[in-house]
Amino acid sequence: MATQMGSRMVFENAKTLVRSLGYSVEHAKLTQSYLRSEVALSTSIANYHIPVLVNDTQNGASRVNEKRLNLQDIFITTEIAVVIGVGTATATAAKLYTYPNATVFTSATDDDLWSIYNGYLNLTINNEQVLPAWDVLRHYFVPQTQQSASTTDQWSASSDAFYPVEPGIVMNGAANINFQLTANGAPATVLANSFIAVVQRGILCQNVTTVK
């Protein structure tokens, strides 16, 4: 559960971490924020590139609900969620799910998504491996109340499917960031317009990198 005391501790830890890396935080704006990266699911892909920076075009144009990191900023990641969504790249009302909901992911697509949950995230920054293997399974969350014809999933988006990151990960907008989700094989089937969303929450430090 999020608390004011916990949020203050996260803020102070992030400030100390950024300062220890040689960046000035005395005149920088430090605020709570988030990053959101999306990539379309595919039956032919087992290695998904997770875009973080605003100028990352490896997967093509950015999707409408993404929130990327500006090159001038640093983001300290303190929580991560990996969820599944359904919607086109331009759908502003695309819904997110914390597990392969059988009401939405019909036929075999719900079972086939286990190849994603049996995979892992890995992160390399400036050719240095920062996160070798972060299991996606820790984000799998099935609520007590599940969706049916007359109900919707119970889901607290402030906590469910989010997992704390310690020590905090420094996402530097001026760095070469290679973020990947490695699935345990490509899904045999996928629902049309379904995608993976990686949401990072933490502290944003504005205008502190070498990029002006």
Regions found by a protein language model. Name each.
Residues M1-K212:
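Beta-strand-centric surfaces of beta-sandwich/beta-rich domains
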